[in-house]
């Protein structure tokens, strides 16, 4: 019996080693990526996609730094991501859980990101200070894509920043 919805289902494993992501995307800030992923989902003739992925990124070069130990587990559509991202890199620890929704004209964000350690200097994200480290808990529940149409709440709690001048504990924002 023919498939009148023209839906394609997929279920399998995808992996790559040292794929030049920068060359593939034209983004000069990106380099090579190595990953393995289990993916299960479907797509239709209108390029709508719905997939569950469980991925481990062993290497991701970005801004002349090689990130390691990234795990992604969640549901992805053409315009949304609901799930978790766990980063256990020596210079950046991150636990992300939540939803990013770009389905409407105004995007919607609802997530928590715990960053117990980030070293901006070693990640090449700060080139001014000789020391640049932070830790914080970031929660967001808002919609918007600029300052004028944003509505909701963003909180930064238990945050600290350290540079060559000392360590600064920040009040909850």
Q: Regions from the language model: what does each represent?
A:
Residues 1-173:
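Interface amphipathic segments
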């Amino acid at each position: 019996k023919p498939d009148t919805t023209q839906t394609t289902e997929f279920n399998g494993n995808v992996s790559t080693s040292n794929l030049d992501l920068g060359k593939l995307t034209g983004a000069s800030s990106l380099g090579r990526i190595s990953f393995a992923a289990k993916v299960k989902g479907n797509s239709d003739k209108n390029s709508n996609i719905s997939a569950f992925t469980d991925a481990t990124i062993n290497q991701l070069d970005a801004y002349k730094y090689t990130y390691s130990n990234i795990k992604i587990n969640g549901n992805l559509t053409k315009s949304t991501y609901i799930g978790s991202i766990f980063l256990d890199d020596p210079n950046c620890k991150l636990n992300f859980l939540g939803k990013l929704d770009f389905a409407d004209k105004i995007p919607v964000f609802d997530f928590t990101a715990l960053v117990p350690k980030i070293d901006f200097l070693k990640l090449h994200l700060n080139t001014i200070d000789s020391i640049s480290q932070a830790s914080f808990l970031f929660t967001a529940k808002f919609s918007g894509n600029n300052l004028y149409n944003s509505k909701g709440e963003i909180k930064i709690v238990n945050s600290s920043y350290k540079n060559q001048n000392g360590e600064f504990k920040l009040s909850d924002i």
